[in-house]
Amino acid sequence: MNTIHYNETVQLQPCVATIGFFDGVHRGHQFLIRHLVETASQENLQSTIITFDEHPRKVLQSDYQPEMLSTLDSKLLLLSKTEVDNAVVLHFDKAMAAMSACEFMQKILHDHLHVRKLFIGYDHRFGHNRSETFGDYVRYGKELGIEVIKNDAFRIDDINISSSVIRSFLKEGEIELSLIHISEPTRPY
């Protein structure tokens, strides 16, 4: 896996991508990553995960200190054990937070990362104040030549697996439950 710390000179080969913080690279993330890799292979494109160096809420709410499931280095190590071609790390700051979803898709996803298909997690939102919807992303994507696809939730025992759910299990002392949701016993990632 190529790890790329994004700047305005970065130019990737056309790719299928997904975007998110990927804290813990848990089973929900792994489910999304498998779809990403399979689709990229079928389309003969590179697979790319776009993530951030800082949790967006930490930047936007200076008093927010999330208990993270992984550091950036450990997240990249976990991602390197998947079949993903590229991991692009964006520096999340106030300037990026001020970008609309349309501007983000144009300047970063289209102009520099050359995204052809974008997988979005079932609960993921991006752009200034996260005010835009999946329908907006689809509309912007059509204008830019990016197909936007919403990935279904990965569920175990009627629970949508997310980093927040795993954090709550850990907080409640449910170590075994959190481990079940973090990784599959038969997979190294």
Residues covered by each model-derived region:
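Short acidic-hydrophobic, aromatic-tinged amphipathic segments that line or gate anion-handling sites
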Residues: N2-E8
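N-terminal catalytic cores of NTP/NDP-binding nucleotidyl/phosphoryl-transfer enzymes
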Residues: E8-T71
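N-terminal Rossmann-like or analogous alpha/beta NTP/dinucleotide-binding catalytic cores
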Residues: K58-L144
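A short, charged helix-loop
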Residues: E143-F154, I161
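Extended, well-folded interaction surfaces typified by the phenylalanyl-tRNA synthetase beta subunit core
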Residues: I161-I166, E174
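Single conserved hydrophobic/aromatic residue that forms the stacking wall/gate
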Residues: I180-Y189
